[in-house]
């Protein structure tokens, strides 16, 4: 099935890893994760026992982040999905550029095949095959 896909690449990520200690890296990466969730929640928040978090309950956008790459995609090719993807992409890019890393990206239309490789073993451990 066709969908809309937004691909982003953080610029300067290699230098960030090479020039900063692990504690600082964890802080900044944690902030990036927070900003990804904030973009997906489009500014909506919900109360939880330890404060507030982004409310992703109504988001229809999928996201995967690995190393210096972020990919968002829709579940279909409707105009509503495209609008939500563009809104999420705009908020993510704005936050990335303004607070942490410049990011370059693109939005494309096409087919995406996603396989969840998460597996569990008999001992309760989880691993990923990709």
Predicted feature locations:
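Short, glycine/charged-enriched secondary-structure capping and boundary segments
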Residues: 20-23, 120-122
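A generic fold-level signal
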Residues: 5, 65, 124-127
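Active-site-proximal structural segments of metal-dependent nucleotidyl cyclase/transferase enzymes
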Residues: 1-9
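Active-site loop/short helix in cyclic nucleotide turnover domains
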Residues: 10-22
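Catalytic beta-strand-to-alpha-helix segment of the class III nucleotidyl cyclase homology domain
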Residues: 74-130
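Conserved helix-loop-beta segment at the catalytic/binding core of cyclic-nucleotide signaling proteins
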Residues: 33-72, 99-101, 108
């Amino acid at each position: 099935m066709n969908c809309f896909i937004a691909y982003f690449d953080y610029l300067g990520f290699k230098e960030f890893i090479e020039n900063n200690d692990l504690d600082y890296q964890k802080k900044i990466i944690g902030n990036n994760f927070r900003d990804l969730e904030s973009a997906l929640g489009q500014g909506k928040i919900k109360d939880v026992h330890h404060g507030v978090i982004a409310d992703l309950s109504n988001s229809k956008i999928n996201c995967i982040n690995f190393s210096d790459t972020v990919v968002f995609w829709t579940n279909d090719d409707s105009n509503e999905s495209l609008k939500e993807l563009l809104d999420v992409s705009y908020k993510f890019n704005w936050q990335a550029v303004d607070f942490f890393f410049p990011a370059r990206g693109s939005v494309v239309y096409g087919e995406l095949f996603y396989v969840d490789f998460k597996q569990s073993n008999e001992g309760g451990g989880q691993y990923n095959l990709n």
